[in-house]
From Swiss-Prot:
Protein name: Acyl-[acyl-carrier-protein]--UDP-N-acetylglucosamine O-acyltransferase
Keywords for this protein: Acyltransferase, Cytoplasm, Lipid A biosynthesis, Lipid biosynthesis, Lipid metabolism, Repeat, Transferase
Designated gene of the protein: lpxA
Pathway membership, UniProt: Glycolipid biosynthesis; lipid IV(A) biosynthesis; lipid IV(A) from (3R)-3-hydroxytetradecanoyl-[acyl-carrier-protein] and UDP-N-acetyl-alpha-D-glucosamine: step 1/6
GO function terms (MF aspect): acyl-[acyl-carrier-protein]-UDP-N-acetylglucosamine O-acyltransferase activity
PROSITE patterns, A to Z: HEXAPEP_TRANSFERASES
Taxonomic superkingdom: Bacteria
Compartment annotation: Cytoplasm
Subunit comment: Homotrimer.
PANTHER family: ACYL-[ACYL-CARRIER-PROTEIN]--UDP-N-ACETYLGLUCOSAMINE O-ACYLTRANSFERASE, ACYL-[ACYL-CARRIER-PROTEIN]--UDP-N-ACETYLGLUCOSAMINE O-ACYLTRANSFERASE, MITOCHONDRIAL-RELATED
Any one of the GO BP annotations: lipid A biosynthetic process
Protein task: Involved in the biosynthesis of lipid A, a phosphorylated glycolipid that anchors the lipopolysaccharide to the outer membrane of the cell.
Length: 258
């Protein structure tokens, strides 16, 4: 059964599925869809067009689906889409997209977004991502599955964070972070393969060994990046992880942290 606290304000056009709960002093605007089993705590503001999937947990004072923080934005109907089973903690801000980039900000499933974090317009987040407190993305940032951003990590617009990457506390990231790697510092620099994280996700020694080999090729061999990439592509024909690394590098517009 859907339960809406009498002190909440829910627009009549908002669509709340079965089992949704809405806490006191929360405001849900028009053109909002909330999936079954989602719990929206007190003092939350959700503006549309926004779609939330099933079984999300929205904690107090989160701002979901407000206008993009872009001076060019002129009120166009852009969107925010959030998948299933996400945890969005206190004071998180998730902004809608802008028309210049297709009008969509998207979060996938099972992400853990801790207090005071910010996801700006047109960002695309995959699944199983963790943001520690006050991690912030500028606009147009892509974050792949299983990435972790430490507290107060800051990511420049148009950067990409690769799958299973770990970005340390306070990192300032102005270029793409390769999948499977760790970076930290101001300005952030790479520090090797994310061995601890990969082991926690069940990756075996041989798989990690091959990734370390690829890391040495890219960062320690002294080769030009184009030459290292060609060699990595050959290795990737028999290794999906290395194939993903090569494709990630080839698709980079801002360049990689190196």
């Amino acid at each position: 059964m859907t339960r809406i606290d009498p002190k909440a304000v829910v627009d009549p056009s908002a669509e709340l599925d079965e089992g949704v709960t809405v806490g006191p002093f929360t405001v849900i605007g028009p053109d909002v869809q909330v999936g079954a089993g989602t719990r929206v705590g007190p003092h939350v503001v959700i503006n549309g067009p926004t779609r939330l999937g099933r079984n999300n947990r929205i904690h107090p004072f989160a701002s979901i689906g407000d206008d993009p923080q872009d001076k060019k934005y002129a009120g166009e109907p852009t969107r925010l889409e959030i998948g299933d089973d996400n945890v969005i903690r206190e004071y998180v801000t998730l902004n809608r997209g802008t028309p210049e980039a297709g009008g969509l900000t998207r979060l996938g499933d099972r992400n853990w977004i801790m207090a005071y974090s910010h996801v700006a317009h047109d960002c695309r987040l995959g699944n199983d991502i963790t943001f520690a407190n006050s991690a912030s993305l500028a606009g147009h940032v892509d974050v792949e599955d299983h990435a972790i951003l430490g507290g107060f990590a800051l990511v420049h617009q148009f950067c990409r964070i690769g799958a299973y990457a770990f970005c340390g506390f306070g990192s300032v990231i102005n270029r793409d972070v390769l999948p499977f790697t760790t970076v930290s510092g101001h300005m952030a620099q790479p520090h090797g393969i994310n061995v601890v994280g990969l082991r926690r996700h069940g990756m075996g020694p041989e798989r990690i060994r091959e990734l370390k080999r690829a890391y040495r090729l890219i960062f320690k061999s002294g080769k030009r990046l184009d030459d290292a990439l060609e060699e990595l592509r050959l290795l990737g024909k028999e290794n999906p992880d290395l194939e993903h690394l090569a494709a990630f590098i080839a698709a980079s517009n801002r360049g990689i942290l190196r």
